[in-house]
Structures are given as structure tokens and as C-alpha cells.
Amino acid sequence: MAVSDNTFSMSTMFNALPNPTETSGYIPPSGFAPRASATPLHAALFNLMTDGDGVSYFKEMISKSDKTELQRMASLLTSDSDYFMSIVTTKFGSRRVQKLLGKSDDVDAFFCAAILRRFLHITTDKYASYVTIRAMVVFDKVMKKALYERILYHALDLACDQHGCIALNDIITDADDPYYRDQLLELVVSNALRLSNDASGNFVVQHVLTLYDSRCIHNIAVNLYGQCIELSFKKYGSYIVEKLLEVEESMVVVVVELLGCDGDRLMRLARNEFGNFVVVKALRFTKEMRMDLFWGLVQKLMPFIHLLRRSHGNNIANILDTFRLRC
């Protein structure tokens, strides 16, 4: 049903909405079928929120709505969890719900309750996750605290989800509460190895490293010590090790592990499609910051220079050629 064909005028729709006080405490049981969504009123609102051609109509309706009307609209949108999910999991539904967030504390209270009821499902959805992200920016401190607690509880689930990891990264970046920000960072740090080996979780570790928090970087390096070489053989793990090499304190931890392994393993790493980038970066940054470690790597790699040629390690062989006469 196109918005232009909607038989419900703005005043008719809002007049038909229930009083907010009648629905604010309603929490449907798990798996509850959204029977209300079959009513003409719910169908009209669903169409308003999700129709790709209804952008201007939605903007007009919101601009002309007063606080009470917006509150009633929020009440109807969140009166049933399944109905709410059916809206926020669509591209336009998510965007329009985000537009409603921050209008007033009363409106936000309805959306906060709805997000908390289906927190994990919402925050791991491709589109709905942006509702949580937006909520963490515009909600008041009390509502943010409730969401922070839920985020901490589900943080690892979010980190290991393809959409949840993006949401978690944004939430960490925008976190304006020092206590909860530190709690989230500590959770990532303490689970660095597990997350580094996860297809989605490694992006969270990478993100925390790009915040350049010296304490976090050091602690991640310490927690990954002994596993850096193994991670370097993997596509995403190698990205994490490369980032650790960019800061001197964590770089030392990685290079000490490289120097401590047997030469054959270091050679295999240097020939690896992902590991060669780690070795090149180790040579580059040790040369800039720690010449003693740089020469240690050169001497350890030099006996294998002939094996590095015509492989992924050819770029390393070229670097070694420059210093061959000095060894």
C-alpha cells in the first residue's frame, strides 16, 4: 500500500492511537504473534515507516506532530515486539525510527524498552543495529545506563557477529561514560585471543588498537604473546599483529616472539601470503625504532634469503639484499 493511497490522515491516525499510559508496561511473551499488526491502523503505520517512496510524507508528518502525538506514535510502534522488529529490520524502517529517537524522554522511554526486550536480535541485525547505535548517542543517562549493562552482558556475542561487531565498535567509539567505556575496553582486552581468532571479533580488536590507548595496546600485546606468529599466518590475525607493530611497546613484544621462534618457522612465515606483510612491517618499524631488534631479524632471516625469492617473501629478500654485505 503506497503512502499516497493511505486512507488515514495524520489526525485520524493519531486520534486512533492508544493512550501511551495504557501500553507502556506491556511486554509480550517470547514468540508472541503480532496480531495487532493486522489491524488497518498498524498496517498504515507500518507502511508509513517502511515505504521507500514515503520519505517526504514521513518528514511532513513528523514535523507537524506535537509531543503527545509523537509519544502515541512511539507507543504504537513498540506495543508489540514482533511488530517493532518487523519495522526496524527494514532499511527505511530503521532510518525512520532513528529519526524519532531523541525527540523527548517520554518518546525515548518507549523505544528504550523495546530495544531492551529484543536487544541481541536488534543489535545484530543489518539495519536494526543502527537503532541501538543511535540510541546510545541521544538517550539520557538513565536509559543509556540500562543499555550499557545489556551491551556488557552481550558484548562477546556482539563482537562475534558480522553486524554486531560494527555496532559494538561504534558504541565503543561514542561511549561518553568513562566507567562503561573502560569496562568495554577491558572486556575486549581480556578476550583478545578469542576475538582475534574470530572472523568478526578480530575487527573489534583492530578497532580498539586504532584508539591508541597505550594501556589497552600493551595489555592486548601481552595477552597475545606466544600467539602472534600463529595469528600472522591468518588473514585477519595478521592485521592485528601488524597494528601491534606500529607502537614501540607492543612492537617489542611481537618481535621478541619472532626472534624466539626457530628459523624454519620464521622462514615459513616470511613466505606466507599473509605473514610476509607482518615480517616486512617488523623490519620497517624496528629499523625506525629499535636497531638492535632490526639486526636480530636480519641475521635470523639471512640464511633463508634464497628460499624467500620467487615466493610471497620476495619483497623481504629484496630488503635483506640491501644489508647482505653488512651481516
Swiss-Prot record:
GO terms for molecular function: RNA binding. Gene3D superfamilies: Leucine-rich Repeat Variant. InterPro entries: ARM-like, ARM-type_fold, PUM-HD, Pumilio_RNA-bd_rpt. Pumilio repeats lie at residues 79-114, 115-149, 150-185, 186-222, 223-260, 261-295. Keywords: Cytoplasm, Repeat, RNA-binding, Translation regulation. GO terms for cellular component: cytoplasm. It holds the Pfam family PUF. It is found in: Cytoplasm. One of its GO terms (biological process) is regulation of translation. Residues 1-324 form the PUM-HD domain. Sequence-specific RNA-binding protein that regulates translation and mRNA stability by binding the 3'-UTR of target mRNAs. The pumilio repeats mediate the association with RNA by packing together to form a right-handed superhelix that approximates a half donut. The number as well as the specific sequence of the repeats determine the specificity for target mRNAs. PANTHER family: PUMILIO HOMOLOG 18-RELATED (PTHR12537:SF166), RNA BINDING PROTEIN PUMILIO-RELATED (PTHR12537). This is Putative pumilio homolog 19. It comes from Arabidopsis thaliana. The lineage of its organism: Eukaryota, Viridiplantae, Streptophyta, Embryophyta, Tracheophyta.
